[in-house]
């Protein structure tokens, strides 16, 4: 199957006429968006795209103006040169793996995925159909990455926030505004009705989308300095050195990301706690997903160190290679 790079982070399949997370070249039939994170969402805000219902709502909340054709999970849509089906990817709300069947064979593009899935997503489901070519993200494609059970990490989040508040401090949880923030809020909702949260202003419209799809985010409001005392603050790591965070009296900071497992990276944020909750596959989940799909060829994307995972895949008998894509991710 012929794969061509499309934009900074996407692909085009000329034999199928389908673009994935990238612009549509002349002569193409459709653009499919795997999920609403900025490195996968359309840069052309007027472009016509296909996506899951939740991804459609999220990219609209982030300013997409063009038509979005909403596709249900496991629904197959036919185009002149290909049939396309979406499967839930478990990464964030709306995230989809994209299965394409054309005269050149079948391909599963995972986008960003996670199994076990995020409880704030629609789940994780592999197609019950052949996969000749698997294009899978390998953001954490090294054996040093093995995640703790989600519930254990959610309990750490709740304990961190409770303990900070009990000590008269303000718990600040650093994580990406879309996906991770809502998962942290969902975890804190289980701390009880007394747990109140503020979220960075850019995350508020995204929280409303999550709630419209039935996700429980507990008690929350957009960030407001005057009413922050007694509440937890959820804000991106990029704000850690801004006045918003630096001026909080008695702040207690947790970095919530798969990258929190790297203390050297996390120490740059002067965090008091490191909670390695990721919305990606760890190394062992990556290998297991490849085994379950059993493709003729595996393509690794978004990996800073592809050679290690490629070596392990080759040892298991897989034909495999890496694809050069930019990696822009908060873990």
Which residues are covered by each model-predicted region?
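His/Asp/Glu-rich metal-coordinating catalytic cores
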Residues: 1-26, 30, 38-174, 179, ...
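Binuclear metal-ion centers of metallo-dependent hydrolases, dominated by the metallo-beta-lactamase
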Residues: 6, 128, 142-225, 297-331
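C-terminal regulatory/interaction regions
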Residues: 7, 190, 214, 219-331
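Conserved G/P- and acidic residue-centered "switch" motifs that form tight phosphate/ATP-binding loops
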Residues: 35
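Short, well-ordered alpha-helical microsegments
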Residues: 41, 95, 117-118, 181-185, ...
